[in-house]
Amino acid sequence: MANKYYPTIGLEIHAELKTQTKMFCACKNDSDEEKPNVNICPVCMAHPGALPVINKKAIENVIKVGLAVNGTIADFSEFDRKNYFYPDIPKGYQISQYKFPIVSGGHLADMDITRIHLEEDTANNKHDRGKYALIDFNRSGVPLMELVTEPHTFESVEVATKTATNFAKEFQLILWYLGASEANMEKGEMRVEANVSVSTDKNTKSKNYVEIKNLNSFRSVEKAVKYEIERMTELLKDGKEKEIVRETRGWDEGKQKTFSQRKKEGSADYRYFPDPDLPKLKLHEAFDLGKMKEELPELPEAKRTRYRNCFGIKNEDIEVYINDKVLSAWFEEVADLLKVPEKVKLASNYITTDYLGLKKTNLDIRCPSVENFAELINLIFENKISSRTAKDILAMMVKNDASPMKIAQEKNLLQKNDEETLKPIIEKIIKENSEAVVSYKGGKENAIMSLVGKIIKESNGSANPQIVIKLLKEMLE
């Protein structure tokens, strides 16, 4: 019987924290600064005698994240020196946390969390100057939070990649909702590393795992994890398990494959020891954790549940709102005005399809006022305008936010519901389309819809389709 292969995934996610200053000095924390080496000082440049001072806001942000994922906040924490030599670390060591992280445990999006700790970011190496490599120290010393998950074993590559990607997406949302980080992956404010191994025994994890470094998009996470699982699986199938070694690998976006970078270091290689220049952290004394827990904002999963229960809208629509706090706030105000569940659902459909469709083609369009948008939905429900006309009116509203009723009146778009007004138009179309009439009378029910379309066109879109169908059937009997 053929072996079954079980992938095991663990994630490490780094996120630059949203603070005014760096982790251990008063230099500005500004990821948008384009001029190199301006936000630097003796502390983040490791000048002799320059001593670090802990950024309390950074610790507060990590605690908030820990509370949001139901982690345990440590009574005691401390910073350690992680010793290694690399040009982007001027001190020869990185200030990090090893034995005593700020947060232990927790759970999010089907994955258990091992720990969340705080460290300083490294400088930014520039390798685009030919034979020279340049270093920008603006990022050096920026507060960097690292989340580490437990390794999780999965039944298939599809489940593994989906779970890993969903976790990263959900964690980014948590950071946004808490205001802890901008977590912009394109700018390197959130970086994902995936530890991957494959085994033929579901209960035994392979010791030879690889770490895929610095994945800077969710698509890269999905593609890199999938590729690496499949690469390892093929080696195992071919009896080449010795070629699977514990190493660090990169992801080549162009070639869509991982590549070997270096042998994977162990914690002993870094010779961690407590930083003698920094005090121990007594977190339960320094922070009111109960109050911080109470003051957490509504988080994504709670918001999903509320939207399902209160509005009954589609899951796809809910995810649109979860990922756009401004849009969701606008929708909630519209829903509060409309109140009727059917109207709220219709409003959501127009927002997530028609309004966002318009915005996709023109980023500069205006968001209609809550009152005007609610009025548009009411006009549809009152049969004063058709759904097609509503789309046209909305396209005008995003330009000047005029009243939809005013637009409908000025453009003669109000729906004609008066049967006596519609009958002459219907009679005209019946006379001009004898073939469709014969087809309908011959049993082809769909033939009536071509007549309906012509009648609505003849009325410049103002004829009520339901009334048109009713009258047509009566007049063709």
Residue ranges and their predicted role:
Residues 341-347, 355-367, 375-380, 384:
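M16/insulysin-pitrilysin zinc metalloprotease superfamily fold
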Residues 445-477:
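Short, amphipathic C-terminal "tail helix"
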Residues 1-298, 315, 337-340, 353:
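Basic, nucleic-acid-interacting segments
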Residues 317, 330, 343-351, 372, ...:
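Residue-level detector of well-ordered alpha-helical segments, enriched
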Residues 18, 195, 230, 348, ...:
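Amphipathic alpha-helical core segments of compact helical bundles
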Residues 187-200, 308-333, 344-361, 397-402:
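Core structural elements
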Residues 364-378, 387-457:
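Strongly charged, low-complexity linkers/loops
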Residues 304-308, 332-336, 356, 374-381, ...:
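Amphipathic alpha-helical segments within well-ordered protein domains
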